[in-house]
């Protein structure tokens, strides 16, 4: 009896490695998106603190207002920059999700094909074994009759 061999085993292994790579890229992009969201929330919180601190300052001078305005502009630019990066990351994430889905589908199709071929092989092995048993029985039966 021969062992089962799937002719596309190397392709399946390569596709599995490809799937793992796509999954790693996806996880990295998700982490980047979470990091950017955290940074954006921190910048927004800092801007809120700056605005609320304006009312709490007793003696505001021109230099103080200029400094606060410059700080507010810097925070706004940072927030806009982070929002742009977040949009870009979202687009990259959507693209990577599609790549991951395609890689997963390719692996699943090969695994299903392997399963079908294994079932066919088992059926053929069982048929051969049945045929061998029948021939053996008939040979013994014929020997006993003679």
Report the location of each language-model feature.
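Charge-rich amphipathic alpha-helical interaction elements
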Residues: 1-146
């Amino acid at each position: 009896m021969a062992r089962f061999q799937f002719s596309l085993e190397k392709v399946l292994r390569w596709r599995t490695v490809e799937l793992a790579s796509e999954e790693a890229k996806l996880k990295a992009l998700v982490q980047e998106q979470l990091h950017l969201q955290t940074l954006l929330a921190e910048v927004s919180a800092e801007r809120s603190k700056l605005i609320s601190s304006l009312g709490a300052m007793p003696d505001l001078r021109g230099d103080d207002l200029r400094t606060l305005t410059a700080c507010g502009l810097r925070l706004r630019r940072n927030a806009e920059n982070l929002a742009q990066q977040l949009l870009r990351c979202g687009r990259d994430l959507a693209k990577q999700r599609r790549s991951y889905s395609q890689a997963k589908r390719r692996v699943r199709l090969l695994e299903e094909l392997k399963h079908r071929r294994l079932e066919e092989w088992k059926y053929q092995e069982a048929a051969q074994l049945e045929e061998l048993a029948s021939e053996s029985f008939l040979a013994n039966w014929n020997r006993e009759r003679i």
